[in-house]
Amino acid sequence: QYKKVLEEKTEQIKQSGVSEADRIMKVENKIAFLENQQKEIQEAINSGNHAFHIARKILEDLDSAKNWSTFDLMGGGLIADMAKYDKLNKVQDKIQDFQNALRGFRTELADVTERISGDLYVEIGDFLHFADYFFDGLFTDWMVYDKINDSRNRTLRTSDQIQKILGQLNDMDNELCCKKENLQEELEQTVLNSDT
């Protein structure tokens, strides 16, 4: 009920043309701008979470492939080979999804790059370089233990970078929430203190 009354009074003030009307519209425009920024940040967070989830799944399969490869190096035989290939096939199936998720994340981050440092942008470019390396390089020699280990380390670094960026995006979102709350409070006080 309070919110509805406040909205009605806000509209009355804006239509009356008193000095507070201009101030109210400026604050409302600032709030709308912040809400748009928050929307862009949330889209980037969602996209980053998707990429992070795929990276974690790839890491699980690479860890398993690494273990089977170690067992194979110690004479594990046909069962170790089959298990290793199975895990590497699962990784290969996920790589294209991961590459697409990284591209999507990069696209979403482009909408908020003016708020993110230049160094971070370079790291985002490295994501795609990593994905291209992984997609092109791993499976030409995928029985080699070192390739599995190297790919695992690259996936882990990329996952860590995604997590770091997600932390920065969450910090930005929290900062925008505080600014928006302050503006909403300013708007409310302007309306309540108006004589209209």
Question: Which residue stretches match the model-derived regions?
Answer:
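Domain-scale macromolecular recognition modules
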Residues: 25-111
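Long, non-membrane, amphipathic alpha-helices that form coiled-coils
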Residues: 1-62, 148-196
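Long amphipathic all-alpha helical oligomerization modules
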Residues: 64-94, 107-196
